[in-house]
């Protein structure tokens, strides 16, 4: 990981990418990141630095204003510089509770404009502000307890109960994931606007990725629903 400390900063589109912790935006489908020209790579890096420098204060201000619990609002932005990773971004927290937003180099290179980068930052930051990691953990625990309890009550074996608990945890974690993505799209659009970027322009990346549709246990809503959510946020903001 290459942290952006060198920038003087304090411091998740789609086939869904499973993260061990945190939340992520789905991946953009590519056969592999195309090698960038030096000038193209430099332009992408400069655009990313510009976006982070404007989005970070907007993100942290929104976090401080909206938080209902004593969560950490000192965001850290990092870049995963490992070669060969597909375009992706995600939000997680470190051992102290500090929020971290990570980006792969390929996502930075794939973004067509600063609005797309800004919207991704706003979306991922919103997952932390809205408490989605804790809510995901709670939902997973609830699903595990309920399904495991049902199997236990019916006389299931220890192995069967453990399997049911694992299945229940996965079901619980996915149950509200689409709603959480839409919530993050809405607040992310507001944060993007507050930083001076255009979230509707930024959300156009949805038009370039496979549509996850409306699968019952899917982790992401349809692209049309997400673009409509961004448009709704912009209309409400105005």
Regions found by a protein language model. Give the residues of each.
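Peri-catalytic and regulatory segments of divalent metal-dependent proteins
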Residues: 13-142, 194-195, 215-217
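Bacterial N-terminal signal peptides that target proteins for export
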Residues: 1-2
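Post-HEXXH active-site segment of zinc metalloproteases
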Residues: 132-163, 203-206
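Long, well-structured alpha-helical subdomains associated
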Residues: 177, 195-238
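DG-centered beta-turn motif at the end of beta-strands
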Residues: 123-124, 184, 222
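Metalloprotease/metallohydrolase-associated module, dominated by Zn2+-dependent proteases
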Residues: 155-201
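C-terminal motif of bacterial Sec signal peptides marking the signal peptidase cleavage site
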Residues: 8-11
């Amino acid at each position: 990981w290459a942290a952006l400390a060198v920038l003087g900063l304090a411091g998740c589109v789609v086939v869904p990418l499973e993260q061990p912790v945190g939340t992520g935006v789905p991946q953009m489908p590519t056969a592999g990141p195309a090698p960038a020209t030096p000038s193209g790579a430099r332009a992408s890096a400069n655009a990313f630095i510009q976006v982070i420098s404007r989005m970070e204060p907007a993100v942290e201000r929104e976090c401080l204003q909206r938080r209902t619990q004593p969560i950490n609002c000192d965001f850290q932005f990092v870049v995963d510089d490992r070669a060969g990773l597909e375009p992706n971004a995600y939000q997680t927290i470190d051992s102290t509770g500090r929020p971290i937003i990570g980006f792969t180099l390929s996502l930075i290179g794939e973004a067509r404009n600063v609005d797309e980068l800004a919207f991704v930052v706003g979306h991922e930051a919103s997952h932390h502000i809205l408490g989605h990691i804790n809510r995901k953990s709670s939902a997973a625990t609830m699903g595990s307890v309920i399904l495991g309890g049902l199997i236990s009550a019916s006389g299931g074996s220890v192995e069967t109960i453990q399997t049911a608990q694992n299945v229940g945890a996965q079901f619980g974690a996915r149950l509200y994931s689409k709603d959480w993505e839409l919530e993050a799209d809405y607040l992310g659009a507001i944060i993007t606007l507050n930083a001076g970027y255009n979230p509707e322009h930024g959300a156009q990346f949805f038009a370039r990725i496979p549509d996850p549709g409306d699968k019952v246990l899917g982790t992401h809503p349809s692209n049309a629903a997400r673009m409509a959510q961004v448009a709704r946020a912009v209309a409400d903001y105005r």
